[in-house]
């Protein structure tokens, strides 16, 4: 199958006002998706769940999607601002034909995107995405007036999802003795995560929970934990929890301000599942996963494999192997025994239940996993030229790999969601890998200048 024109690793994403994130394109996308999804759902409900994060552009894109779906004969059930995993859950429980999320995840407010979920609450198969793109190449033709779709609001969508999240936390446990700072990135979890934690008994200090349409992910959330760390120390909290704009990622901070990333959380979950005799097989990470995670899991005799970067790749490998737990160091973690996609709130609850049931701190849970220093630099790269194909860049990479030998790793890749080249260097000594990473960046930038 040829490469997708519009769909990336996580749906369709881009700058609002520029193709493809324009109201006219999104309207036609709704129509094309409606025509295809009606054939891949149950065919009975004729309903699609639509959720969004808190970006100001969400109103415009929601209306466009709604119109396009109606023109195809499908009705829209609107949730308002809701975490991405909540839409996956609601799609299943409402037996909808599909779920659609309007979000650009951890990106700034001026970006937005569209993600699709199947009737089972899973990411759409790439073949279905291809069929949608095929329909997009056709002229929009409205269905007969009497068959047009409608639109309605789902009553208490947030309450339904809150109860689902709480249901994944052991009924005999409570968070009453914990003080937790929660940073919702001014995003879709702002009215969900604090309430989940409070209803389970925690003393909650909520920050970045006042979205205004343009402050989503702005110096807050899982991509910038400086304010969270400050508040944890200032309020003498037991830990801090940070979500990204659409709630499918989570990063934590222990009581002394140490960052706890996705790799450390994977280790905590793997060890607890092993102890509870619930671990099926092993753990799926990605090529970005720290070598320290692999070594720590080896000590526990837990198998560890690496998938390509992206939750879709992690999910595919989990299903292929029949395993439950996988994720990325960015905090995007999947627990297939709990839900069908990455869910930051549910992952955090499993970490909290491990703390409470074992009467240990988050700091103590991380004691036996030692992450190697890792440098990640994003190099802006617009246009169609891929500097990673340059012979000059390839030669420099080979030289640096020889310098690192078996004492570290290098990973270079193009982002599937943003116009960046990701440069990752990992090794035992921070000063050395920082020097090597910046050498690579200099060569990449030099090649882009020479091409331009």
From Swiss-Prot:
Gene3D superfamilies the record matches: Alpha-D-Glucose-1,6-Bisphosphate, subunit A, domain 3, Alpha-D-phosphohexomutase, C-terminal domain
UniProt cross-references to HAMAP family, sorted A to Z: GlmM_B
Protein name (database record): Phosphoglucosamine mutase
GO molecular-function terms, A-Z: magnesium ion binding; phosphoglucosamine mutase activity; phosphomannomutase activity
GO biological-process terms attached to the record: carbohydrate metabolic process; peptidoglycan biosynthetic process; UDP-N-acetylglucosamine biosynthetic process
Sequence positions that bind Mg(2+): 105, 244, 246, 248
Family per similarity comment: Belongs to the phosphohexose mutase family.
EC number: 5.4.2.10
